[in-house]
Regions:
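Catalytic cores of alpha/beta
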Residues: 6-13, 50, 56-74, 124-139
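Catalytic alpha/beta active-site cores
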Residues: 1-4, 16
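Short beta-strand/loop segments at the ligand-binding rim of alpha/beta enzyme cores
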Residues: 1, 20, 39-56, 71, ...
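Short hydrophobic alpha-helical runs that function as membrane-insertion/retention elements
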Residues: 21-22, 73, 142-143
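Short secondary-structure boundary segments
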Residues: 25, 76, 145
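Active-site-adjacent beta->alpha loops and helix N-cap segments on the catalytic face
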Residues: 3-9, 25-50, 55-65, 79-102, ...
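Alpha/beta catalytic cores of nucleotide-metabolism and tRNA/nucleoside-modifying enzymes
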Residues: 67, 89-120, 125-204
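Catalytic domains of carbohydrate-active enzymes, especially glycoside hydrolases
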Residues: 13-23
Length: 204
């Protein structure tokens, strides 16, 4: 879900059978995310799990934890076709962000008894990257490029320069934004393109 049309989208998703929601934004440390979480909590209580993000430091994690997020996504600008760092000038190395947020999660658990899982989102290109992210403290992973290569991904298989490829685009790209998947909130005229369209080598 995003933090713009949640009042319409969330009830429709719940009615369709969803029991876990995730707010998708490149900037999770924002009042818009808190408002979205508050809406879900006021309407559905704890019967629906809601994750939030993305953040890259302890302050961002604590903000979302205290706002009531059930899990937190970590990573800004690390995706293989993400250009948030170039267009907005924000972001952080994925390993550094993950280690700091994992430490904040553990400290929060010691203080409150509430364990909030964290998801490493972005920059996981090769198999060993998964192992590294888990070793650095991630509870689970979010991956796009890795799975976009396969038949099961919904995009078209094409031949480019004699090789099979699959279409792939960033969640912050204009193409994805047309589907209202990736939104910060606020005025629609204040928007940045934060991803690009590309291809990945077909893997079967």
């Amino acid at each position: 879900i995003n933090s713009r049309d949640y009042a319409e989208r969330v009830p429709a998703l719940i009615e369709a059978g969803a029991d876990v929601l995730c707010i998708d934004s490149s900037e999770g440390f924002s009042c818009w995310q808190k408002k979205t979480i508050d809406f879900v909590r006021e309407k559905y209580g704890d019967s629906v799990k809601v994750g939030a993000g993305n953040v890259v430091d302890a302050d961002g994690f604590l903000f979302l934890a205290e706002a009531g997020a059930d899990f937190v996504k970590v990573g800004i600008g690390g995706g293989s076709i993400c250009i948030t760092r170039e267009t907005k000038g924000i972001g952080r190395g994925q390993a550094t962000a993950l280690i700091e947020v994992a430490a904040a999660r553990d400290d929060y658990y010691k203080r409150t008894g509430v364990y909030i899982p964290i998801c490493s989102d972005g920059g996981l290109v090769h198999d060993y990257h998964m192992t590294l992210a888990l070793a650095m403290g991630a509870d689970f992973l979010m991956m796009g490029r890795y799975f976009a290569r396969f038949d099961e991904s919904p995009t078209a298989k094409l031949i480019v320069n004699g090789s099979y490829v699959k279409e792939y685009w960033g969640e912050g790209s204009n193409r994805a934004r047309n589907w209202q998947r990736y939104d910060l909130g606020g005025q629609s005229k204040l928007s940045f393109e934060e991803g690009v369209d590309s291809y990945v080598t077909y893997a079967g």
